[in-house]
Amino acid sequence: MNEKESNILRMQELIEELNKYSYSYYVLDNPIVADKEYDKRYDELVELEEKTGITYPYSPTNRVGDVILKQFQKYTHKSRLWSLDKAQSFEEIIDWHNRNKKAVAEYNSNHEDKLPELKYVLTKKFDGLTINCTYDESGVMIKAATRGTGVIGEDITSQAKTIKSIPLKIKNGSVVEVHGEAIMTKTAFNEYNKKAEVPLKNLRNGAAGALRNLNVRETARRNLSAFFYDVGYNEGKAFKSYMEMMNFIKEMGFPVDEYLKECNTIEEINKEIQYVGDIRSSLDYDIDGVVIVIDDYRTREYLGYTVKFPKWAIAYKFEAEEATTKLLDVEWNVGRSGRVSPTAILEPVELAGVIVKRATLNNMDDIGRKKVKIGSRVFVRRSNDVIPEIMGVTEETEGETNEIEAPTICPYCGSEIVKEGVHLFCENTLSCKPQMVKSIVHFASREAMNIEGFSEKTAEQLFEKLNIKSISDLYRITKEELMSLDKFKDKKASNLINAIEKSKKCDLASFVYSLGIPNVGKKTATDLCKQFKSFENIKKASYDELILVQDIGSIVAESIVEFFKQEKIEKSLNELFELGVTPFYEESEVVENAFTGKTVVATGTLQNYSRTAIKEKLESLGANVAGSVSKKTDYVIAGENAGSKYDKAVQLGVKILTEEEFEQLINNM
């Protein structure tokens, strides 16, 4: 073997290794090699490719995207990519199901080779760009194309190769076309927009715009992902069912979404649609519905197609989470930290089943980057049940528009506004009503000092009528003063005084949280207490000591240090302690058990625990409770309708416990 042959052999070894590493990292979310080791092999491959002048089409070096194309070429799909019929209501799903039942019954009454009972498979309907990847007899991806008309699409092979989860070579000996959806995750979207001169307006446009960009380097910058869900053209062994076909896709190394649900009844389908709708906002990518297909391929063949759609599939569409409307005005609001933030007043628009009239604009820098003006038509997005956000302006804005101007004085107290970084602040912390009211409400809230019977209306009256100017003033209020307020009689006043008095003896984590330290939530407050054991230790902790605490980074550490440096905070704390507030810390002794130090995920509906209760129970056992399943998860506790987290646990080989097994374990400790 000469040197060139030896180099080529080594290149093929490296390509196989690197593609295996990429599959484990990007598809299974289970890295099997350190980044440094991957980079070492990758650099060796680059060097050998330069030396030999050979680059194989399935080499990972093709994913860099270092090319600018002159134009898109047309590509004729080997098999048509069908659109799906769509249902906006569940009644339409029932009608579709009844048509299927009738057709199958008619066939079975006239044929001896009976069709099986109807079984459906449900998948998420991804909101991205459909792609069709073609692999030759050697298993090499030779083409990737958009759906286009369904018959003819556009060649996006170079762009698709930048999606690291798409295999460039599969172990298959026949020509096959595999259909998927290219998507942009919310994580990738947010990372891209941090640095983008012109921010992306939504995830779908982010994915579609990347794949239809002739500058492939720009495609690579957007860090797209993909899920695959269908085989179109296939010269290999025919599939008998959708589930068999999906197993083939998985075995070939394609990224497949963890949610894949088999249903036998219309009631099960309805339950699953509701489940996917419930988890929709918690996903890291956009979906706009659920796809329902018949599993059996013989039944599919018998039902056939309309001019536009297959009769054996339908898509249930969710309410839109994104819409366009007109920006009517901007209102400036003050938070408890003194930050003055813009809120958009919108022409009312329906979004995810809710009428939306207001949306966040973040800050003036964000307004400038998105080119938003009063009178503009804007994209509005709602997710995670939070206040909707304006993502950008549409191209069809008509009529007069006006620049949004930042205020120079506080809209509530008239004090001068100062700019710190990208944010505006009112520094009048003592007599600016929104700041004081919101600080008191936060201090008294259930997770903080837990003062029962305290409300925002009460806080407003305390500020306006009793001249309360700090949280310590709460502990100076008398019953007689409370009875001078609206709707306060003897009993209500007594109850609130007793609740305020009772709050003086509080656990340390609740007290730390009640102070409203920027970027410190209840979990961070709890972590601080576990680490430092006393309030005095937390207060005097240095930056270097703070960043050693689990989940505390530089921003949170700086916030804590700066907070305790302030003279007004020192004064307020001293007053609270003088008035009898005595936070205490009790270190709960955790007996070594099966869950100590383990990462646990609870999913589905549990019979004996609410979400909060199971979280508290696990934490009391010394477990770390996580919200998603990964290779670092030790246990998954699965209740009814466990769904995608259960599926991922099975895929990764994570130990799964039923609620009964969990209780048996803790009862035997």
From Swiss-Prot:
Pfam families assigned: BRCT (PF00533), DNA_ligase_aden (PF01653), DNA_ligase_OB (PF03120), HHH_2 (PF12826), HHH_5 (PF14520)
Protein's UniProt keywords contain Ion transport: no
Cofactor(s), by name: Mg(2+); Mn(2+)
Record-level GO cellular component terms: cytosol
Gene3D superfamilies: 5' to 3' exonuclease, C-terminal subdomain, BRCT domain, DNA ligase/mRNA capping enzyme, Helix hairpin bin, Nucleic acid-binding proteins
Catalytic reactions on record: NAD(+) + (deoxyribonucleotide)n-3'-hydroxyl + 5'-phospho-(deoxyribonucleotide)m = (deoxyribonucleotide)n+m + AMP + beta-nicotinamide D-nucleotide
Leading EC class: ligase
EC number from the UniProt entry: 6.5.1.2
GO MF annotation: an example: DNA ligase (NAD+) activity
GO biological process assignments: DNA repair; DNA replication
Binding locations of Zn(2+): C410, C413, C426, C432
Function as written in the Swiss-Prot or TrEMBL entry: DNA ligase that catalyzes the formation of phosphodiester linkages between 5'-phosphoryl and 3'-hydroxyl groups in double-stranded DNA using NAD as a coenzyme and as the energy source for the reaction. It is essential for DNA replication and repair of damaged DNA.
Protein name listed in UniProt: DNA ligase 2
Gene for this chain: ligA2
